[in-house]
Amino acid sequence: ADDQQRELYCIPHQVDQIEEWAQSLHKRFGGVIAVALELSKGPIVYALQKYDFFVIYPVNPSTLAKYREAFTPSRAKDDPTDAELALDLLIRHPERFTPLKPQSVEIRTLACLVEQRRNLVNDKIRITNRLRSTLKQYYPQMLEWFEQLDTVLVCDFIARWPTLTQVKRARKNTLEKFFHEHNMRFSHVLDVRLKSIKAAMPLTLDAAVVTPYSLQALVLTDQLRVSLQAIQRYDDEIAKLAPKHPDYGLFSALPGAGPSLAPRLLVAFGEQRERFASAAAVQKYAGIAPVTERSGKKHWVHWRWQCPTFLRQTFVEWAAQTINKSFWAGAYYRQQREKGWTYQSAVRALAFKWIRIVYRCWQTRTPYNE
C-alpha cells in the first residue's frame, strides 16, 4: 500500500474479530503499523496494546473536531470520515503526535486503582448529600449531633434509631454503651450529646412525612455503608501496592500527601522522566497553567478547558492540604487571598508553584525537605 491508497473497514466489536483483523494487517504489511485513535485508554486501546507491531497514536477528539470543521463548515459528522481525517492528520503532521508508551504494570495498576477509588469517594459524597437533605425533612437534630455523616457511627445510629421518637425512648445506659462501642469515650462530649437527645423536640410528627423519609434515610445509610467498605478495600489494596514502587518515597515525603494523595501524585508524574521536558509541560498537561488569549487590544487569561480532570483534581486537592502543613505554602496562600483572589484561584496558584518544586525532586530523585 502507498500513502494515496485508502481502504475503509468496520471491525466488529468482538475479541476474535479484532484478533483476526490485527493478524491480517501484520501478515499483509509486516513490520510496525501506526494506529490513530481518539482514545488513550479503554477497551480498544487495551486490546491493541497486546500486539507489539502496533504503535498507537492518540488523537485528541477536539483536535479532530476542529480539523473536520475546517473542511466541513456545516459541521456534518460521520465516523468513517472521522477515521479518514485522523489518518490524514497523522500522515501530514506526525511531529504533532506522541505514540502511546505504556508504563509498567505496577504504575498502570495503581493509576486505575486511585481513579476508581476517587469515583467511589464521589459516590459517597453524593449519597451523603442526599442523606443530609433527607434528615433535614424530619430529623434535623442528627445534623447537630454529628458533624460528619459519612461515618460508620452515623450509619449504625440511624439503623438503630431512624427517628427522633425512637431515640428519645432509648435508656441512657443503652446510648452510652452504643457510643462506647464506637470509641466515643469523652465524657463531657457524651454528656452534652445525651442531654441534647433527651431535650430535642421533633420537627414534625406527621406520619406522611416521617415514615417515607425515615425509610429513605435507612436505605441511604445502607448505600453509604457499602461505599465506605468499598473505599476501605481500595485503600488496603493501594497501601499494599504503592510503597513497592521505588519513587513512592519521593511523594510520601511531601507535606499533606498522606496515604491517599501520595499514590495519586506518584501516578500523576509516573515513571517515564523523559515524558515531560520541563515543569511547565506538567503544569500545562495537568491544566494548572493558565491560558492567555490575545487579539488586538484584548487580553484574556483563563484556565484550561481541555485537560485530564482527575490529574488537575489531584494537584488542586493536594495543594489545599499543604496550606496548614507547609509554612511557605500557607504564607503564599494567604498572600493570594489578601490580593482578593478566590479560594479556588489561590489554591490553583499554589498548585502551580508546587509542581515546579516536585518536578525538580522527581527528576533528581531527591526527597522534599522544607
Question: What is the predicted function of each stretch?
Answer:
Residues 1-370:
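A detector of single, family-specific signature residues
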